[in-house]
Amino acid sequence: MNELRKGRQSIVFPNYPSIAASAAVAGKKEGKGPLRADFDQIAADTKLGQASWEKAESMLQKTAFELALEKASLACGDLDILFAGDLLNQCISSSFAARDTNLPFLGLYGACSTMAESLLLAASFVNAGYAKRAAALTSSHFASAERQYRFPLGYGGQRTPTAQWTVTASGCCIVSTGGKGPFIEGATIGKIQDFGIKDANNMGAAMAPAAIDTIRQHFEDFHRRPQDYDLIVTGDLGLLGKQI
């Protein structure tokens, strides 16, 4: 029996990788919301002084990455690998953010699951001894996502009632051996669940079945109940996806 597997879809990390530090950077709109106090930095300008939305998103990643390193009292060279992703073609914002780090880089494309995916992979590398310290980094930007998935803002198209608002923000966690925690003890990897959603704007409804299936499988694999957790968080399912 493989002691690193748990149930049907889960894995465990017996060496308990820890989150040494984390940082979150948000856009102006997000800075006015209920999570304002939890952001390390709030941008006053949605373009962050850059020439394009995509460059602005890359700057969000750079800022979150540098803040996380600073909070962990580490230099970039103290890391062994960088896992980063975004919502854009060729992970362009992540690639440009990683360009100046001189770190081994694995680009991820998991949509709203990218932060969880990057943490899963970082914890896997640290737990197995392939890395002593790894960074898990992701970002999104409302304007760059609109251009990628819906309509460029300059087009002036009307948003559908089912279209959620993609967050302008970036988050980074430094995952390492030892430490005081919080620790990553395991992970559950989800499956594709296609319920035939035809509305291309309603991404929340398209993702909701996979989210609930993964959460259900996590409880089953680890023999736990929802009450055992202080908080259960998903990617952005939007209002309709959350209701589902």
Each PLM stretch: what is its role?
Residues 1-54, 152-216, 221-224:
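Condensing-enzyme catalytic core mediating Claisen C-C bond formation in acyl metabolism
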Residues 19, 53-110, 228-243:
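Conserved beta-ketoacyl condensing-enzyme motif
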Residues 20, 83-85, 134-140, 175:
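Short beta-strand segments
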Residues 24-25, 84-90, 140-141, 180:
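Short glycine-enriched loops at secondary-structure junctions
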Residues 30-32, 93-95, 145-150, 243-244:
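Short acidic, glycine/serine/threonine-rich loops at helix termini
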Residues 35-38, 94-104, 126-128, 149-158:
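A glycine- and small-aliphatic-rich helix-loop capping segment at beta-alpha/alpha-beta transitions
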Residues 55-73, 119-121, 206-221:
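Short, well-ordered amphipathic alpha-helical segments that serve as non-catalytic structural scaffolds
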Residues 108-136, 175, 209:
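Active-site-proximal alpha-helical scaffold in enzymes
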